[in-house]
Structures are given as C-alpha cells and as structure tokens.
C-alpha cells in the first residue's frame, strides 16, 4: 500500500493533477539540494515530496504569478544591493590609492 495514501494527499491539494505537479517540483527541489522540511521515512525524493505534502509542509502557492513577481523583486533587490556594495568597494580602493599617492 502506498504511504502516504492518495486519499490523504488529495485532501491537501485541489486535484490529482495539482498533486502530480507539486510532487514533481518538490522532488526536483530536493534532488537539487533544497533543505528538507522534516525527517523522512523514504529514500526516494518523489516519496519524500509526498511525505512533505501529506504533512502540510509543502503547499501550492495560491497566487503563482504573485510568487513569481515577489521572486523577481527579491532578485532585483539583491542585484542592486551587490552593485551598491561593489561601487562602495571601488570608491574605497580609489580613495586609498589617492591617499597613497599623497604620501
């Protein structure tokens, strides 16, 4: 018998198609090294994903486009922060060179 049971899993998602997509995406994340949300009984990433879905630790985002936009904003913000940090470092190096030439 499949553990977790399909009936239990279908209580967590709107349809069996959503379940398959969610399981596949989470299994890929786990294979890529994403941190687990719990301890597992299973060895395979697909079964681990099902365990997380059953426990409620992994769910479908209610607004996927909103999530994508939030991720885009976070990436852009991180990029801006890195550019500002790089600019400050370059300014500091230029200032140190200028101070070194004065001596």
UniProtKB/Swiss-Prot annotation:
An example molecular function term from Gene Ontology annotations: bacterial-type RNA polymerase core enzyme binding
TM spans, by residue? none
Q: Which keywords fit this entry according to its UniProt record? A: DNA-directed RNA polymerase, Nucleotidyltransferase, Transcription, Transferase
Reactions catalysed, semicolon-separated, are: RNA(n) + a ribonucleoside 5'-triphosphate = RNA(n+1) + diphosphate
Q: What InterPro entries has UniProt attached to this entry? A: DNA-dir_RNA_pol_omega (IPR003716), Pol_omega/Rpo6/RPB6 (IPR006110), RPB6/omega-like_sf (IPR036161)
**Record GO biological process:** DNA-templated transcription initiation
User: SMART domains recorded for this chain?
Assistant: RNA_pol_Rpb6
**Tree of life domain:** Bacteria
A Pfam family of this chain: RNA_pol_Rpb6
Q: What is its EC number?
A: 2.7.7.6
Q: Per the record, what is one GO cellular component?
A: cytosolic DNA-directed RNA polymerase complex
| Disordered, as annotated region | 52-103
Q: Where is the composition biased (Basic and acidic residues)?
A: 62-103
Name the enzyme group at the top EC level.
transferase
Instruction: Give the protein's biological function.
Output: Promotes RNA polymerase assembly. Latches the N- and C-terminal regions of the beta' subunit thereby facilitating its interaction with the beta and alpha subunits.
Q: Spell out the family assignment given in the record's similarity comment.
A: Belongs to the RNA polymerase subunit omega family.
Q: How does it assemble?
A: The RNAP catalytic core consists of 2 alpha, 1 beta, 1 beta' and 1 omega subunit. When a sigma factor is associated with the core the holoenzyme is formed, which can initiate transcription.
Under HAMAP family, the record lists: RNApol_bact_RpoZ
- Its recorded name reads DNA-directed RNA polymerase subunit omega
